[in-house]
Design a protein with these regions (language model features):
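N-terminal leader/targeting segments
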Residues: 1-37, 58
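Short, intrinsically disordered, low-complexity terminal segments
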Residues: 6, 19, 28-30, 54, ...
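Assembly/interface hotspot detector across virion components, adhesins/toxins, and nucleic-acid enzymes
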Residues: 28-33, 75-84, 97-98
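Short glycine-rich, basic-tinged beta-strand/loop micro-motifs
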Residues: 29-55
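Short, ordered beta-strand-loop transition motifs
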Residues: 33-41, 81-92
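Short, hydrophobic/π-rich interface segment
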Residues: 50-84
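C-terminal edge-of-domain segments
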Residues: 84-107
Length: 111
């Protein structure tokens, strides 16, 4: 399915561009963390002075899940991590890893 690295990078950029539009209003950073022919993991992260929680975190997660379902139309697994980052101006961050069964959609993007 992936005949070369350039093609895979193009697909990753396209997914990131679409995902950023869903999250940019709340200041979240989005990247494709991992991509295989079977799945894509979206890494969604936000740094802040306090742990990210409540409505802001839920809104970003809802946007990510909605995007993944709309884009790929399949199941979504979500992991959430909160951890303190020492010696930084933004000592807390939250990361959502949204893994989607992307075989059909990735094949379309690769074509």
């Amino acid at each position: 399915m992936f005949d070369n690295i350039d093609n895979m990078a193009r697909i990753e950029r396209e997914i990131e561009k679409r995902m950023e539009a869903a999250c940019e209003k709340s200041g979240w950073y989005v990247a494709v963390a991992m991509m295989t022919p079977e799945s894509t993991t979206l890494h969604i992260e936000k740094f802040g002075e306090e742990p990210v929680a409540g409505e802001d975190a839920q809104a970003a997660l809802d946007s990510a899940v909605a995007f993944a379902k709309a884009e790929f139309g399949t199941s979504v697994e979500v992991e959430r991590f909160n951890e303190k980052i020492p010696n930084t101006r933004a000592p807390y961050h939250v990361t959502f890893l949204v893994k989607v069964d992307a075989s059909k959609r990735v094949a379309e993007l690769a074509a």
